[in-house]
Amino acid sequence: PGNRALLESSLEQGLMDKLQAFLLELGKGFAFVARQQRISTESKDFYIDLVFYNYLLKCFVLIDLKTTELTHQDIGQMDMYVRMYDDLKRGEGDNPTVGILLCEDKDHSVVRYSVLNGSEQLFASRYKLILPSEEELRTELAREAEAIRLAMELGEQEASRGTEE
Protein backbone atom coordinates (compact mmCIF):
# COMPACT_ATOMS: atom_id res chain seq x y z
CA PRO A 1 0.00 0.00 0.00
CA GLY A 2 2.80 2.47 0.85
CA ASN A 3 4.59 1.61 -2.40
CA ARG A 4 1.35 2.28 -4.33
CA ALA A 5 1.03 5.73 -2.69
CA LEU A 6 4.65 6.51 -3.59
CA LEU A 7 4.00 5.40 -7.18
CA GLU A 8 0.90 7.63 -7.41
CA SER A 9 2.81 10.56 -5.90
CA SER A 10 5.68 10.11 -8.40
CA LEU A 11 3.20 9.92 -11.27
CA GLU A 12 1.39 13.05 -10.08
CA GLN A 13 4.67 15.02 -9.67
CA GLY A 14 5.86 13.94 -13.12
CA LEU A 15 2.56 14.88 -14.72
CA MET A 16 2.57 18.30 -13.03
CA ASP A 17 6.11 18.92 -14.36
CA LYS A 18 5.07 18.02 -17.91
CA LEU A 19 1.76 19.87 -17.78
CA GLN A 20 3.41 23.04 -16.52
CA ALA A 21 5.94 22.91 -19.38
CA PHE A 22 3.19 22.06 -21.93
CA LEU A 23 1.04 25.07 -21.03
CA LEU A 24 3.97 27.48 -20.99
CA GLU A 25 5.18 26.17 -24.37
CA LEU A 26 1.74 26.74 -25.94
CA GLY A 27 2.54 30.43 -26.02
CA LYS A 28 -1.09 31.40 -25.49
CA GLY A 29 -0.69 33.84 -22.64
CA PHE A 30 0.06 31.48 -19.75
CA ALA A 31 2.20 32.79 -16.90
CA PHE A 32 3.14 30.44 -14.07
CA VAL A 33 1.95 31.61 -10.63
CA ALA A 34 2.34 28.73 -8.17
CA ARG A 35 2.53 25.02 -7.54
CA GLN A 36 0.73 23.45 -4.57
CA GLN A 37 -0.64 26.88 -3.65
CA ARG A 38 -2.33 26.95 -0.27
CA ILE A 39 -5.73 28.54 0.15
CA SER A 40 -7.43 28.42 3.51
CA THR A 41 -10.85 28.50 5.09
CA GLU A 42 -11.27 29.26 8.80
CA SER A 43 -10.69 25.61 9.66
CA LYS A 44 -8.82 23.93 6.80
CA ASP A 45 -6.00 24.37 4.30
CA PHE A 46 -6.32 23.27 0.68
CA TYR A 47 -3.59 23.00 -1.96
CA ILE A 48 -4.14 23.74 -5.65
CA ASP A 49 -1.78 21.69 -7.83
CA LEU A 50 -0.98 24.36 -10.43
CA VAL A 51 -1.97 28.01 -10.74
CA PHE A 52 -1.43 30.09 -13.87
CA TYR A 53 -2.54 33.54 -14.91
CA ASN A 54 -3.56 33.91 -18.53
CA TYR A 55 -2.90 37.48 -19.58
CA LEU A 56 -4.82 37.10 -22.87
CA LEU A 57 -7.96 36.02 -21.01
CA LYS A 58 -7.17 38.17 -17.96
CA CYS A 59 -7.99 35.36 -15.55
CA PHE A 60 -6.46 32.83 -13.20
CA VAL A 61 -6.42 29.21 -14.36
CA LEU A 62 -6.42 26.60 -11.59
CA ILE A 63 -5.44 23.02 -12.36
CA ASP A 64 -6.11 20.07 -10.10
CA LEU A 65 -4.59 16.75 -11.10
CA LYS A 66 -6.06 13.45 -9.94
CA THR A 67 -4.43 10.06 -10.43
CA THR A 68 -7.60 8.22 -9.43
CA GLU A 69 -11.08 8.08 -10.92
CA LEU A 70 -12.85 11.44 -11.01
CA THR A 71 -15.54 11.81 -8.32
CA HIS A 72 -18.32 14.30 -7.60
CA GLN A 73 -16.26 15.38 -4.58
CA ASP A 74 -13.38 16.32 -6.92
CA ILE A 75 -15.73 18.45 -9.02
CA GLY A 76 -17.19 20.09 -5.90
CA GLN A 77 -13.69 20.74 -4.58
CA MET A 78 -12.65 22.46 -7.82
CA ASP A 79 -15.79 24.59 -7.76
CA MET A 80 -14.87 25.59 -4.19
CA TYR A 81 -11.31 26.46 -5.30
CA VAL A 82 -12.67 28.63 -8.13
CA ARG A 83 -15.09 30.44 -5.76
CA MET A 84 -12.39 30.99 -3.15
CA TYR A 85 -9.89 32.20 -5.74
CA ASP A 86 -12.43 34.62 -7.16
CA ASP A 87 -13.09 35.96 -3.65
CA LEU A 88 -9.48 36.10 -2.45
CA LYS A 89 -7.26 36.71 -5.49
CA ARG A 90 -9.25 37.97 -8.46
CA GLY A 91 -8.52 41.60 -9.26
CA GLU A 92 -11.01 44.26 -10.28
CA GLY A 93 -10.27 43.96 -14.01
CA ASP A 94 -9.92 40.16 -14.04
CA ASN A 95 -12.37 37.76 -15.64
CA PRO A 96 -13.77 34.83 -13.63
CA THR A 97 -11.28 32.16 -12.57
CA VAL A 98 -11.23 29.00 -14.69
CA GLY A 99 -10.73 25.59 -13.09
CA ILE A 100 -9.43 22.56 -14.97
CA LEU A 101 -9.72 19.08 -13.46
CA LEU A 102 -7.41 16.51 -15.02
CA CYS A 103 -7.89 12.89 -14.12
CA GLU A 104 -5.52 10.15 -15.21
CA ASP A 105 -6.39 6.66 -14.11
CA LYS A 106 -5.37 3.36 -15.61
CA ASP A 107 -8.31 3.22 -18.02
CA HIS A 108 -8.50 6.71 -19.45
CA SER A 109 -7.88 10.40 -19.07
CA VAL A 110 -10.68 12.80 -18.20
CA VAL A 111 -10.61 16.58 -18.49
CA ARG A 112 -13.29 18.84 -17.01
CA TYR A 113 -13.46 22.60 -17.21
CA SER A 114 -15.13 24.53 -14.42
CA VAL A 115 -16.32 28.09 -15.00
CA LEU A 116 -18.83 28.94 -12.33
CA ASN A 117 -20.67 32.07 -13.33
CA GLY A 118 -23.33 30.69 -15.67
CA SER A 119 -24.02 34.13 -17.12
CA GLU A 120 -20.47 34.33 -18.48
CA GLN A 121 -21.30 32.63 -21.81
CA LEU A 122 -19.35 35.19 -23.83
CA PHE A 123 -16.25 34.63 -21.73
CA ALA A 124 -16.66 30.84 -21.93
CA SER A 125 -16.67 30.94 -25.73
CA ARG A 126 -13.58 33.19 -25.67
CA TYR A 127 -11.56 31.01 -23.31
CA LYS A 128 -12.13 28.03 -25.62
CA LEU A 129 -10.15 29.87 -28.29
CA ILE A 130 -7.13 30.32 -26.02
CA LEU A 131 -7.10 27.42 -23.56
CA PRO A 132 -6.12 23.99 -24.88
CA SER A 133 -9.12 21.85 -25.76
CA GLU A 134 -10.19 19.00 -23.52
CA GLU A 135 -8.97 16.62 -26.23
CA GLU A 136 -5.52 18.27 -26.43
CA LEU A 137 -5.13 18.07 -22.65
CA ARG A 138 -6.45 14.50 -22.53
CA THR A 139 -3.99 13.38 -25.24
CA GLU A 140 -1.03 15.13 -23.58
CA LEU A 141 -1.95 13.74 -20.16
CA ALA A 142 -2.31 10.16 -21.43
CA ARG A 143 0.96 10.35 -23.41
CA GLU A 144 2.94 11.72 -20.48
CA ALA A 145 1.39 9.32 -17.95
CA GLU A 146 2.34 6.36 -20.14
CA ALA A 147 5.91 7.65 -20.56
CA ILE A 148 6.26 8.16 -16.79
CA ARG A 149 4.82 4.71 -16.02
CA LEU A 150 7.21 3.06 -18.49
CA ALA A 151 10.18 4.92 -16.99
CA MET A 152 9.13 3.88 -13.48
CA GLU A 153 8.68 0.23 -14.55
CA LEU A 154 12.09 0.28 -16.23
CA GLY A 155 13.61 1.68 -13.04
CA GLU A 156 11.96 -1.07 -10.98
CA GLN A 157 13.24 -3.76 -13.38
CA GLU A 158 16.78 -2.37 -13.20
CA ALA A 159 16.57 -2.19 -9.40
CA SER A 160 15.40 -5.81 -9.14
CA ARG A 161 18.18 -6.93 -11.51
CA GLY A 162 20.67 -5.14 -9.28
CA THR A 163 19.48 -7.08 -6.21
CA GLU A 164 19.69 -10.41 -8.06
CA GLU A 165 23.37 -9.91 -8.97
Describe each region flagged by the PLM.
Residues 1-165:
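Charged, terminal alpha-helix-loop-beta segments
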